Swiss-Prot record:
Signal peptide: 1-23
Keywords: Cell outer membrane, Membrane, Signal
Gene responsible for this protein: lptD
Name this protein carries in UniProt: LPS-assembly protein LptD
Gene Ontology CC entries for this record: cell outer membrane; transporter complex
Subunit structure: Component of the lipopolysaccharide transport and assembly complex. Interacts with LptE and LptA.
NCBIfam families for this protein: PRK03761.1
Main function: Together with LptE, is involved in the assembly of lipopolysaccharide (LPS) at the surface of the outer membrane.
Keyword Signal: yes
Cellular location(s): Cell outer membrane
Family per record: Belongs to the LptD family.
Biological process according to GO: Gram-negative-bacterium-type cell outer membrane assembly; lipopolysaccharide transport
Amino acid sequence: MNKKHTLISLAILTALYSQQSLADLHEQCLMGVPKFSGEVVTGDVNSLPVYIEADNAEINQPNDATYQGNVDLKQGNRHLLAQSVQVKQSGNQSTPLRMAYVRNGFDYKDNQINMLGKDAEFNLDSHDGNLTNSEYEFVGRQGRGKADNITLHNNYRVMKNATFTSCLHGDNAWAVDASEIRQYVKEEYAEMWHARFKIHGVPVFYTPYLQLPIGDRRRSGLLIPSAGTSNRDGLWYAQPIYWNIAPNYDLTFTPKYMSRRGWQANGEFRYLTSIGEGKVAGEYLGKDRYSEYASDNRKRHLFYWNHNSSFLQNWRLNINYTRVSDKRYFNDFDSIYGRSTDGYANQYARIAYYQPNYNFSLSAHQFQIFDDIVNIGPYRAVPQLDFNYHKYDLANGWLNFKLHSQAVRFDNDSKLMPTAWRFHAEPSLNSLMSNKYGSLNIETKLYATRYEQKKGSGKNAEDVQKTVNRVIPQFKVDLQSVLSRDITFLKEYTQTFEPHVQYLYRPYRNQSNIGSTLNNDYLGFGYDSALVQQDYYSLFRDRRYSGLDRISSANQVTLGGTTRFYDIAGEERFNLSAGQIYYLSNSRIDENPANKTPTSSSAWALESNWKISNKWYWRGSYQFDTHTNSTSLANTSLEYNPEKNNLIQLNYRYVNQEYIDQNLGKSANAYQQDIQQVGLVVGWEIANNWAVVGRYYQDLALQKPVEQYLGVQYNSCCWAASVGVKRNVTNHQNQTRNEIVYDNSIGITLELRGLGSNDHQSGIQEMLEKGKLPYIRAFSLD
């Protein structure tokens, strides 16, 4: 078998021959856990009376009583069954001490723990007790074991020569033997001294001290490690260490050793306060020993900060900041804080104030790009001040007024690039008329912009016009309607047709004097403008360019429409949208012929979604250039999703080279040709608690696989193990244009389960999210 098809074949076979998935694993595991029968008594249980039944009783009031044969003792939530119980009372009548002595075996139950043992002593007033040769099992959650001696207290239990496991009866996959175990009931954790970790009864690990959670509360300590191997990292091992600093603060520190790179320190701090929540993370490798960088003494690092807060009722603060040491960081390291396929790291901060009819904000925004070809990076917008205002229902409800205004300074790391202040005001008036047949929106708008530009300080920096004033009016008429009918050939279905017609006019202004000409190939136009990627919904946008530096002329009519099919329950099952722009005159931004619409109409754009059934979903989009009779862009996805975690998805995507260069710049496609990829993603839960994920993407133009992944996870009630094998396209320094470089890696994760209430996940979602091309669900009409 051809090697590149091996992973995909395994994924298909797994799906075809899998048995019906078992019920939810968490529910299965709870079926083997004892449950408390009856209603839980709250309050001070110790103050409740004690009820005793037995075959025989010898009572010597008020000091003692002996019960023999089928003794049944109850107090609140406590229930004791035994063959012999002696109850003694001492002290005075106001503060009596009541003790129960159990001999020749007992069965004790309450709402937290069940115990079987030989002999026991109970203080019926304080609930303290001492048990010998006992077996115990938690109520309502996994956890059981044995102990030579158990001392019970109100909030904790002390066990001597004890064992603990979260495995159910009949499963001895793992257990911990310890000279002493202390289980803290309210805090929900256990301390163990001289702990020996055993797998199927065989000791494999010893530690003088160990902590394990026995509930849902977060606890400081070691988390589950992971290990693996890859071409770039060599053998690697990562050990997370968790510190529960406070209920609203925690820190996870993860040292990671890579045999080919060295030690990497990773940390993540999470916080939740009255004025906001967020996450601060860092990754640091002091010296990268990988062969490509060994002579550079290169430090590799990442910093990440995400923060969201609301304060003083009307104020909002948002920060999303990621910075890495170099452009190749996400190529060389797997990180949850970014991917190489993103193309850039976002660095953004914004503080805003909101009122019902206006808001203003102060922000700073820049990008760190990863493209090796680009020597001049994008502009940073620091500072940027925005003010928005609206007033509706003017002129007796006929008019609505909106105002967007902005002042922003643009700067660049390159001394060849000019800097600028941009001042912009954008008032608009619109009148919206609607009835049951549709709506008509008439809008007029004015773009008034002033630039104060300064030549770059570099030796060969180009001259720029110091002051540029640009005023562009806009007029738009937008007509929409909704028509419906019952379908004769599809009984119990209703079809709607929603025609959409828009006329847009904006006069031409030559804007070549805004910004530099050096950044057009890779960074768009001006300071923050670039062509917007096209789809059906973009046909009705006001502008072809993002940002404000390029506002193209427009004299165009857009015709489009959407048809929808609804079933008898009113659920949308299918839709299809199609449209095209007809240019009455060329749309231009300057005198360069390359920057105008070359034809009298845009490409046809189509979007469609089909919920074939509750298990099958299909989505597709397509753009066809009628003037070249060629496809500009196409993608489709078909997904079978019978259950929550079971899915098979087949997808295809195509983008021609002309579309890429026009919309994304020449640097977006290193191979200078069309992108044509087919992919298959399989995620399936199969019998005996196995889960498998297979992912394969093939570039049909390059005739090379882009990414291959096979992940297998075994899940039981008390442990899980996963293995992931991955092969994906990467790159290295000084790589030639036609060279394809792959990174092969294997990752292994072991996990103890049953220690919390929500740790029985199949692992499919985690495996689907791994990789350069993570799974994206086919859009459905749910």
